[in-house]
């Protein structure tokens, strides 16, 4: 492949503080192949600050060895303390700029090591777990963001996540994160139950309006070569599902779109939103054998 004469930006790391924005461009130069997003070249980081997001990006671009090219930029990384407001500001800015990466996957980063030393592991971690991360264009709604831990020796995906809504940023536990992934059909997913690990490779999630509440049915299938899921574990999954749905609802996220299900059944009338009290939800879990 030809060697590009551009600095190929692979990811943006964006942090907002009291004095404005700090932007780090994770880029490849000059060995990056012009036609491949998996080009082999050292990943470097170029960091700059600015009173505005635009100014911070411009300053960082000026410090690159060659003109910035965002064609292969697929990841947007935010500080772990980021809010939905920050994501929306970034989304609005990128709509009108050459960066224009609204389809980029969004992650939060918990940083305890200098970015310059860990730029390559950070990008690799984002690439490895991209399928479980939302796109930036989804920021207009509530979203659950995966968290990457950037440490001295490595970058690794946390088993916990954060829920970003207009109400704020809410941490989700390991168990709640796994259940949220299951309900969003991001599979396979594993749970630690009854001192054993179960891994579901498939799960059908169905939701029906039932009286004044809802019935949620999870029909799953375990990964081949793993122990059968017991009745006790099914009941634990039911309780965890109920807990996760309620926690998300109370913090502004209707994870299973219960409001839309209600609207389809009753037609006109008062809409059910997360501003209402959490409705009654009956959860059932069943496992299919091979």
Q: What residues fall within each predicted segment?
A:
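Membrane-proximal alpha-helical signals and transmembrane carboxylates
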Residues: 1-290
């Amino acid at each position: 492949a030809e060697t590009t004469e551009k600095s190929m930006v692979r990811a943006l790391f964006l942090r907002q503080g009291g004095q404005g924005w700090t932007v780090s461009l994770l880029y490849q130069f000059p060995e990056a192949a012009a036609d491949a997003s998996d080009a082999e070249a050292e990943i470097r980081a170029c960091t700059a600050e600015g009173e505005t997001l635009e100014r911070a990006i411009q300053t960082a671009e000026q410090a690159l060895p060659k003109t910035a090219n965002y064609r292969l930029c697929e990841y947007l990384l935010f500080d772990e303390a980021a809010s939905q407001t920050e994501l929306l500001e970034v989304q609005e800015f990128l709509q009108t700029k050459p960066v224009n990466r609204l389809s980029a996957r969004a992650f939060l980063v918990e940083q305890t090591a200098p970015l310059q030393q860990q730029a390559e592991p950070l990008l690799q971690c984002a690439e490895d777990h991209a399928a479980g991360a939302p796109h930036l264009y989804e920021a207009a709604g509530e979203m659950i963001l995966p968290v990457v831990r950037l440490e001295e020796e490595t970058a690794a995906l946390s088993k916990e996540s954060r829920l970003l809504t207009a109400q704020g940023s809410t941490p989700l536990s390991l168990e709640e994160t796994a259940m949220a992934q299951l309900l969003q059909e991001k599979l396979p997913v594993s749970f630690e139950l009854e001192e054993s690990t179960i891994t579901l490779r498939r799960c059908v999630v169905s939701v029906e309006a039932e009286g004044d509440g809802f019935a949620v049915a999870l029909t799953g299938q375990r990964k081949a070569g793993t122990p059968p899921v017991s009745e006790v574990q099914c009941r634990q999954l039911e309780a965890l599902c109920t807990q996760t749905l309620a926690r998300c609802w109370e913090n502004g996220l209707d994870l299973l779109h219960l409001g839309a299900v209600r609207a389809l059944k009753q037609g006109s009338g008062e809409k059910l939103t997360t501003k209402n009290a959490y409705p009654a939800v009956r959860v059932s879990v069943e496992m299919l054998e091979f």
